[in-house]
Amino acid sequence: MADRRNLFFFYGDDKATLVEKMKPIYRILEENGFTILDHPKNANAIVSVGDDATFLQAVRKTGFREDCLYAGISTKDEISFYCDFHIDHVDTALQEITKNEIEVRKYPTIQVDVDGSTSFHCLNEFSLRSSIIKTFVVDVHVDDLYFETFRGDGLVVSTPTGSTAYNKSLHGAVVDPLIPCFQVSELASLNNNTYRTLGSPFILNHERTLTLKLRPDGNDYPVIGMDNEALSIKQVEKAVVRLSDKQIKTVKLKNNSFWEKVQRTFL
């Protein structure tokens, strides 16, 4: 990151307070040859200030750029999965950057195409959920294979890094982000003689394509989740999900691996 000198800082809630707190850090950065930009267009490093939710927003609002690095500064009690640095210790982080104590990790994303007209990426997960208090029916296809018919509250498709989020609360597996794959988990599936699903999360490799076809039973206006944002689409017939070639390059400390974060967070 030492050669990435044009920085854009992305803030979530309470921006005014955080900007004021960051001013001394801005001075330190500028004294060390960094330029603070007001717009991400010409940035080659984008830094989120907040928490993991802020980091997800920073990536989405700046277009999942592959030509720059993303870094996260936590304002909470601890560093988190996407935030390797803390707002109270950024001066220490700068020393680690200049001493080459950091490394760049590439995280996979998933691409979702809805009805051939709307396309977007997700860093954590894509979710398809019933928008009313009623189950909906989805035919699940893996590549060209009709796999199962799901009836329930929804489906969640997560990346390896997203496997520790919504997916984990659905008893999905925590997946090493070095494995190029994506995972499908169920939300309250209904299993009987008419509808039968695998009943457990399943993992698809990077060459697979997942197709979700909604049956028109009066509940084909689902809520579509893109990480921590909702997408409003009047009617959905089909969603096609695959692992994207687009990867997000993040800055992490060498002594703070994915599994160390998992251990610190859950054990």
UniProtKB/Swiss-Prot annotation:
Compartments, record wording: Cytoplasm
Cofactor: a divalent metal cation
Main location: cytoplasm
Gene Ontology biological process: NAD metabolic process; NADP biosynthetic process
Keyword set includes Transport: no
Cystine bridges: none
Coiled coil (residue ranges): none
E.C. code: 2.7.1.23
Reaction it catalyzes: NAD(+) + ATP = ADP + NADP(+) + H(+)
Classification via Pfam families: NAD_kinase_C
Residues that, per the record, bind NAD(+): 52-53, 124-125, 151, 153, 164-169, 188
Active-site residues (renumbered): 52 (proton acceptor)
Gene Ontology CC terms: cytoplasm
EC top class named in words: transferase
Single GO MF descriptor: NAD+ kinase activity
Keywords: ATP-binding, Cytoplasm, Kinase, NAD, NADP, Nucleotide-binding, Transferase
Recorded family membership: Belongs to the NAD kinase family.
PANTHER family per record: NAD KINASE, NAD KINASE 2
HAMAP family: NAD_kinase
Its job: Involved in the regulation of the intracellular balance of NAD and NADP, and is a key enzyme in the biosynthesis of NADP. Catalyzes specifically the phosphorylation on 2'-hydroxyl of the adenosine moiety of NAD to yield NADP.
Protein name in UniProt: NAD kinase 2
Native source species: Bacillus cereus (strain ATCC 14579 / DSM 31 / CCUG 7414 / JCM 2152 / NBRC 15305 / NCIMB 9373 / NCTC 2599 / NRRL B-3711)
